């Protein structure tokens, strides 16, 4: 190989390395724009159950909350409650939804709906509630409100969603309400089928609860949208990625530090984002809706649900 060719190859490699380093530094600097919300680091305070505590680091569970609010500072119920599980042993990424109407015990407030925990005491109480009622080991969270989610989706260029004919009228109806608040013009969804939805359309899709599947299908739609965002981010090129990161992160709140977010993101992509496994809890046949004092709650078989959730999240991993 001639010296000129060697120099040319070395120059190309040097440029690639430089771009990679600059991109990494840029992304890291933008991580500081995430709103850091400190929560307790004490396992006892977070109600980490002894049944889940010994699993070690084979599976990392992070709570994800989709918040129903219009102003950053106002108290909000968690319209979506999910657990993102990074399973290092089986090299899987799993996304679990917990029904928001689940009838659970919330510290200081007695038995009520799961999604009230965030409004009563923010992310820390919400994490405590999940851990204590489902015997889990969640120590951190990520949260985004629906307006932030809309911005994120628009930044990645929309997401591909399979829209059914019975969902169209609800998508357009939800968008009309959002448009009044945001003073925007809506772009109505016209036809069913797989299509690229913009931020407002995709968020409206995720909020539908009046089709035949009710709230059960709603949780599935929420997971579909979140998974579509993950897949879209993974496919971004090196020139697009910094732009997306700079726009995405200011919409996010988290207990994780910038270093931890980088580490978690790297782990998630390394484990594979193309086929995120999904599940919803409680499972069918182990729960029933019931009116208590005129309010709808979802009652569930606690022992069975805990066992099913652990089997799904931890699989064959045994406590240390």
Task: Give the predicted meaning of each segment.
Residues 6-90, 266:
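Entry/capping segment at the start of metal-dependent catalytic domains
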Residues 44-52, 71, 102, 253-320:
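C-terminal solvent-exposed extensions
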Residues 46-51, 64-70, 77-82, 116-131, ...:
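N-terminal post-signal-peptidase region of extra-cytosolic proteins
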Residues 57-60, 76-81, 90-98, 109, ...:
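Extracytoplasmic
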Residues 69-73, 112-120, 135-140, 192, ...:
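Second-shell loop/turn segments in exported
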Residues 74-78, 108-109, 117-125, 143-147, ...:
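Soluble non-cytosolic domains of exported or imported proteins
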Residues 120-183, 257:
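Amphipathic, coiled-coil-like alpha-helical scaffolding segments used for oligomerization/assembly
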Residues 154-237, 319:
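Flexible, polar/acidic helix-loop-strand segments at domain edges
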């Amino acid at each position: 190989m001639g010296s000129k060719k060697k120099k040319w190859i070395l120059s190309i490699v040097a440029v690639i390395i430089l771009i990679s380093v600059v991109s990494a530094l840029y992304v890291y600097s933008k991580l500081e724009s995430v709103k850091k919300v400190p929560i307790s680091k004490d396992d006892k305070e977070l109600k980490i159950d002894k049944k889940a505590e010994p699993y070690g680091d084979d599976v990392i569970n992070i709570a994800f909350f989709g918040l129903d609010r219009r102003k950053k500072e106002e108290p909000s119920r968690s319209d979506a409650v999910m657990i993102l599980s990074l399973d290092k042993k089986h090299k899987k990424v799993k996304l679990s939804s917990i029904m928001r109407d689940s009838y659970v015990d919330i510290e200081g407030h007695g038995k009520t709906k799961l999604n009230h925990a965030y409004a009563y005491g923010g992310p820390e109480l919400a994490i405590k509630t999940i851990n204590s009622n489902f015997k889990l080991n969640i120590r951190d969270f990520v949260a985004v409100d629906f307006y932030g989610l809309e911005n994120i989706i628009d930044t990645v260029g929309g997401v591909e969603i399979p829209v059914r004919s019975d969902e169209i009228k609800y998508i357009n109806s939800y968008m009309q309400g959002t448009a009044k608040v945001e003073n925007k013009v809506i772009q109505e969804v016209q036809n069913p089928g797989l299509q690229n939805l913009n931020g407002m359309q995709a968020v409206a899709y995720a909020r539908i609860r009046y089709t035949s599947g009710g709230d059960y299908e709603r949780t599935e739609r929420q997971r579909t949208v979140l998974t579509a965002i993950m897949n879209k981010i993974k496919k971004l090129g090196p020139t697009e990625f910094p732009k997306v990161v700079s726009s995405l992160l200011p919409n996010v709140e988290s207990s994780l530090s910038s270093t931890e977010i980088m580490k978690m993101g790297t782990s998630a992509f390394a484990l594979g984002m193309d086929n995120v496994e999904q599940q919803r809890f409680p499972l069918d046949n182990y729960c029933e809706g019931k009116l208590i004092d005129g309010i709808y709650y979802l009652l569930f078989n606690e022992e069975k649900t805990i066992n099913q959730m652990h089997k799904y999240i931890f699989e064959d991993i045994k406590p240390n």
